[in-house]
Amino acid sequence: MTNLSGSMPSSTAADLQPALRVEGLGFYYGTKKVLEGVTMAIPVGKVTAMIGPSGCGKSTLLKAFNRIAELEGRVKVTGKIEFFGQNIYDQKVNINSLRREIGMVFQRPNPFPTSIYDNIVYGVKLCCNVSRAELDEIVERSLTRAVLWDEVKDSLKKSALGLSGGQQQRLCIARALAVNPKVLLMDEPCSALDPISTLKIEELINSLRENVTITIVTHNMQQALRVSDYTAFFNTDESRIGQLVEFDTTQNIFSSPQETQTRDYVAGRFG
């Protein structure tokens, strides 16, 4: 169990240890209900996509996983989210430690207005007492994992703001990887990128999956098919506010969904 002081979609997934387990989750911003009765589990070492129309609560769930949603205002949580067996909303949980263990990459690249090098080491310096040599190793390793090292190794002291949009997003991924998270959350990481940069991010996701559990929110159905092992479909209408409609292997969600709403959504009939 990680020290920070849902049911599975198929028999195959049930054999996998969950990195995150959600049980009966309800989530409110103030008095506004955003999620209701969500139960699911994110298996370790897999990529899980969350899809659904705008406003269905998928990004809110992503932000609930590392409690960053609390930065957006007063929230109320019912039910439970466990991270390797520990309730992340327990009063004993250190939120900063949780956010190191569960990193996040946002829709638009958000590099700090500092050098490429300082972007990578920022989180490491906050949590750890390491030497300059160790920092240098972390920078190279993180940028290499993000498939960016060869492009920036001679420009580490230059501003990160001078990078292209795709490079900035890979830098943000490298920055998250620098503190060795167990889980990486991605909220539509390619929505602001061109097709070539999107391809590089998708290739990066595939290269990271063996070492980091990844959960990605995407509106791109083809992207979900390309990069994910499991897919969760959320929907919102007059009768279902922010509810999980179906969770299964990505292959099953797109080829043989069990719910009519899922079938209509992946076929492009709404959303």
Curated annotation (Swiss-Prot):
InterPro entries found in the cross-reference section: AAA+_ATPase, ABC_transporter-like_ATP-bd, ABC_transporter-like_CS, P-loop_NTPase, PstB-like
Membrane topology: Peripheral membrane protein
Catalysed reactions, semicolon-separated: phosphate(out) + ATP + H2O = ADP + 2 phosphate(in) + H(+)
Binding annotation for ATP: G52, P53, S54, G55, C56, G57, K58, S59
Subcellular location as annotated: Cell inner membrane
UniProt EC number: 7.3.2.1
ABC transporter domain boundaries: 20-266
Molecular-function GO term, any one: ATPase-coupled phosphate ion transmembrane transporter activity
BP GO terms, sorted: phosphate ion transmembrane transport
Keywords: ATP-binding, Cell inner membrane, Cell membrane, Membrane, Nucleotide-binding, Phosphate transport, Translocase, Transport
Main location: membrane
GO CC annotation terms, alphabetical: plasma membrane
Disulfide topology: none
Subunit structure: The complex is composed of two ATP-binding proteins (PstB), two transmembrane proteins (PstC and PstA) and a solute-binding protein (PstS).
Similarity section: Belongs to the ABC transporter superfamily. Phosphate importer (TC 3.A.1.7) family.
NCBIfam families: 3a0107s01c2
Record's function text: Part of the ABC transporter complex PstSACB involved in phosphate import. Responsible for energy coupling to the transport system.
The protein, known as: Phosphate import ATP-binding protein PstB 3
Organism placement in taxonomy: Bacteria, Bacillati, Cyanobacteriota, Cyanophyceae, Synechococcales
